From Swiss-Prot:
Compositional bias annotation for Basic and acidic residues: 11-23
Species the sequence originates in: Maricaulis maris (strain MCS10) (Caulobacter maris)
Name of the protein this chain belongs to: Transcriptional repressor NrdR
Cofactor note: Binds 1 zinc ion.
Domain ATP-cone as annotated: residue spans: 49-139
Family membership noted in the UniProt record: Belongs to the NrdR family.
Entries under InterPro entries matching the protein: ATP-cone_dom, NrdR-like_N, RNR_NrdR-like
Species lineage: Bacteria, Pseudomonadati, Pseudomonadota, Alphaproteobacteria, Maricaulales
Alphabetized GO MF terms: ATP binding; DNA binding; zinc ion binding
Protein's job: Negatively regulates transcription of bacterial ribonucleotide reductase nrd genes and operons by binding to NrdR-boxes.
Cofactor dependency: Zn(2+)
UniProt-listed NCBIfam families: transcriptional regulator NrdR
Example GO BP: negative regulation of DNA-templated transcription
Amino acid sequence: MRCPFCGHPDTQVKDSRPAEDGNAIRRRRQCPSCAARFTTFERVQLRELTVMKKSGRRVPFDREKLNRSIQLAMQKRNIEPDRIDQMISGIVRRLESTGETDVTSDRVGELVMEGLKNLDAVAYVRYASVYKDFHKVEDFREFITDEALTAHFGPREDDDG
């Protein structure tokens, strides 16, 4: 594998171990030219996925883009990185296992919402605020109430209960 730092065409594997509950292999590599170390992951890819955007555009599915959007919602949340990786792997497996190569951006968003709801309520609401395009505070209130998340955030001040 080419070194991402100096471009040397061959790197050495220093350590290799299972990751993501055995669904991936994590490899630590070192470049013999510049001595830089980096990590790679090897995963099974059942099929090439294409995401159909709301605009009609079709783009290749990008696991890293999915990871970045979830990491943004998880910012400053005390969640183990392995749990996030497991959630992402689960989403990808579900998308690949449908047998379809085309998936809608809505379907990807729904799966992320489902995963975050089970993982962290604050991250769930953060992601929803972008995915569902919240524009005002009332949008948050309605979403939290509609999604029965009051147990996570407490009752509204104007509730009579």
